[in-house]
């Protein structure tokens, strides 16, 4: 897989569930993923993607019961980096079509209580201008967890984007038009979790169990309209 064909789409890594972990990844170069954020409640509760100085994109199933700390610009979750910013959340806005049973429209916007200071360590990701296809290459997945242990540092992984047919066959009658799959069906590497926000997948990254991700390109209008009205 060529580097220049990899969509650097942060898959707002969801670590709400025990088995949502990186398999076969590596430690990201420090500060190489400036849009990655941590939803922090005394531990890395979930992940997200900074998409403007005031807004973070995450998964709807990551909505907490109260406001929490959004950590930006971090490489090590426990060690001060000198580049990190800690900002409280102000509002959580789930997509109105989110279905907790099917995980369709598993996407959410988080308004920050104050704007982030943008620099080379904290920088928004660019929303997609079109939907990715399997022939485009793969996706880049950063996360704060690994399958064999819980690392303190940000983990990275590059996995192929799978075709719709492959995705449907892996999860019969469970995939909607708002979902995409990424991973290796032969096992070995996966995020077990999103061109998109990490949504769901198998409990373990086993054979024929790719990760399922929310297709962010289907929600760009909703994202922009919500941000404009917020």
Residue ranges and their predicted role:
Residues 1-31, 116-120, 125, 132-140, ...:
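Extracellular/luminal ectodomains of metazoan preproproteins built from arrays
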Residues 36, 55-57, 84, 107-109, ...:
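Conserved hydrophobic/aromatic beta-strand scaffold that supports enzyme active sites
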Residues 28-32, 50, 64, 100-103, ...:
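Extracellular/periplasmic catalytic domains that process cell-envelope and extracellular macromolecules
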Residues 69, 73, 91, 115, ...:
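Alpha-helical recognition domains of nuclear gene-regulatory proteins
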Residues 56-59, 63-100, 157-158, 164-166:
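Conserved H-D interstitial segment of serine endopeptidase catalytic domains
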Residues 81, 93-99, 115-151:
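Active-site substrate-binding loop(s) of clan PA
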Residues 1-57, 68-74, 79-80:
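Protease-domain processing segments flanking chymotrypsin-fold serine proteases, especially trypsin-like
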Residues 18-22, 36-40, 138-230:
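Extracellular trypsin-like serine protease catalytic domains
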């Amino acid at each position: 897989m060529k580097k220049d064909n990899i969509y650097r789409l942060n898959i707002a890594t969801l670590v709400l569930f025990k088995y949502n972990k990186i398999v076969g990844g590596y430690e990201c170069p420090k500060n190489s993923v400036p849009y990655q954020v941590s939803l922090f409640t005394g531990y890395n509760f979930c992940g997200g993607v900074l998409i403007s100085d005031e807004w973070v994109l995450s998964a709807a199933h990551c909505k907490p019961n109260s406001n929490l700390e959004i950590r930006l610009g971090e490489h090590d979750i426990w060690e001060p980096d000198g580049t990190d910013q800690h900002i409280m959340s102000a509002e959580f806005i789930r997509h109105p079509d989110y279905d907790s049973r099917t995980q369709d429209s598993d996407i959410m916007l988080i308004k920050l209580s104050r704007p982030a200071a943008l620099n080379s360590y904290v920088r928004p990701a660019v929303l997609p201008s079109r939907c990715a296809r399997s022939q485009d290459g793969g996706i880049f997945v950063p996360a704060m967890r690994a399958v064999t242990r819980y690392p303190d540092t940000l983990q990275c992984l590059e996995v192929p984007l799978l075709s719709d047919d492959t995705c449907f066959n892996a999860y019969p009658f469970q995939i909607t038009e708002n979902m995409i799959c990424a991973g290796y069906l032969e096992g070995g590497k996966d995020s077990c979790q999103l061109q998109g926000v990490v949504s769901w997948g198998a409990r373990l990254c086993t054979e024929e169990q790719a990760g399922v991700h929310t297709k962010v390109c289907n929600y760009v209008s909703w994202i922009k309209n919500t941000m404009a009205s917020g």
